[in-house]
From Swiss-Prot:
Source organism: Mycoplasmoides gallisepticum (strain R(low / passage 15 / clone 2)) (Mycoplasma gallisepticum)
Group of enzyme by EC: translocase
CDD domains named among the record's database cross-references: ABC_cobalt_CbiO_domain1
Binding positions (ATP): 59-66
Gene Ontology, cellular component aspect: ATP-binding cassette (ABC) transporter complex
Disulfide bonding pattern of the chain: none
Domain ABC transporter, chain residue ranges per copy: 22-271
Subcellular localization, as worded in the UniProt entry: Cell membrane
Protein name per its UniProtKB record: Energy-coupling factor transporter ATP-binding protein EcfA2
Gene coding for it: ecfA2
Function: ATP-binding (A) component of a common energy-coupling factor (ECF) ABC-transporter complex. Unlike classic ABC transporters this ECF transporter provides the energy necessary to transport a number of different substrates.
Lineage, highest ranks first: Bacteria, Bacillati, Mycoplasmatota, Mycoplasmoidales, Mycoplasmoidaceae
Length: 318
């Protein structure tokens, strides 16, 4: 069973400055402590997140990804380490520490950080779609009239027209339910959004729409944290990748810093993105294609374009 007893802090959390929005310092999480089943899900996490960036957290199953992000919005608290969350509106940091017996301003924390779970459609429970989308904003203090406007706006943004507002969510298809559930999260208008396996169970069209949604969130100056096992999507969207292994951050960096490091890739069982694998294969066949690494193509379309460019440049020189 998870324990969250209070202990005195051994050090003060470092204040967040500039574009910093979230910091974990010495964060640990242990289940069944001091029993034969003791398991350290997190074992000393130190990392700072900044606004207007997309972070992808990757790692083998059981590496601590979901446990980490569920600390960020207060679903789990730990007796080891601290979390600092930037509250720009009130010009201070919300600090969750071993001394935190009860999180103050919990609604404010929910307003700052929201989370789209792996299958968000199972969160629907109201008798109309409008009420489902309004639930989060109203619970966090938004007036019902404003919440109704938000419901309409974000439902439309997710590709469903306003005629769905009075429909029961239980009359929708699985894909439509997911759109409604995500609209409800977006309507909270959080500064930090966490997506847990956002493309799981989606068809190619749905995956593309989800990627576009994540990229749009970044354009709105939000911090986006994505947990995924799909390395193709990591390469496509991530500004920074955090690789977890056995509850620790093994390394972090840009997608190409991670995926082109053979030592890192050999340490884990993570599959290379197809684009990187193709570059590796081409480089072995002909050294001129090593230049492709410099371009850092994100998608197959990008790769095709830079391959043509590398070939043209080679032909010009020869």
């Amino acid at each position: 069973m998870f324990k969250s007893w209070s202990k005195r802090l051994k050090y003060a959390p470092t204040p967040l400055v500039g574009d910093e929005v979230l910091r974990a310092q010495g964060l640990k999480c242990v289940f069944d402590e001091k029993t034969p089943e003791e398991f350290w899900a997190l074992n000393g996490i130190d990392f700072t997140f900044e606004k207007n960036k997309i972070y992808c957290i990757i790692g083998n199953s059981g590496s601590g990804k979901s446990t980490l992000v569920t600390h960020f919005n207060g679903l789990l608290t730990s007796k080891y380490g601290t979390l600092s969350i930037r509250d720009f509106k009130n010009n201070h940091d919300i600090v969750i520490s071993p001394n935190t017996k009860k999180i103050k301003n919990f609604k404010r924390l929910r307003k700052i950080i929201s989370m789209v779970f792996q299958f968000p459609e199972y969160q629907l429970f109201k008798d109309t779609i409008q009420k489902d989308i309004m639930f989060g904003p109203v619970a966090l203090g938004v007036h019902k009239e404003e919440a109704a406007k938000l419901a309409k706006f974000y439902l439309n943004r997710m590709g469903l027209d306003s005629s769905y507002l009075d429909v029961s969510p239980f009359e929708l298809s699985g894909g439509q339910k997911r759109r409604v559930a995500i609209a409800g999260i977006l309507a909270i208008q959080s500064e930090i959004i966490i997506f847990d396996e956002p493309t799981a169970g989606l068809d190619p069209k749905g995956e593309s729409e989800m990627v576009e949604l994540i990229l749009e969130s970044k354009k709105e100056n939000k911090t986006v944290i994505v947990i995924t096992h799909q390395m193709e999507k990591v390469l496509e969207i991530a500004d920074e990748v955090i690789l977890l292994d056995k509850g620790k951050i093994l390394t972090s960096g840009t997608p190409y810093q991670i995926f082109t490091n053979p030592e890192i890739m050999q340490t884990t069982s993570i599959a290379l993105p197809h684009v990187v694998q193709v570059i590796n294969d081409l480089s072995l066949r002909n050294p001129i294609f090593k230049k492709l690494y410099d371009y850092e193509p994100r998608t197959v379309k990008d790769l095709a374009k830079v391959i043509n460019e590398v070939i043209k440049n080679y032909e010009k020189r020869n």
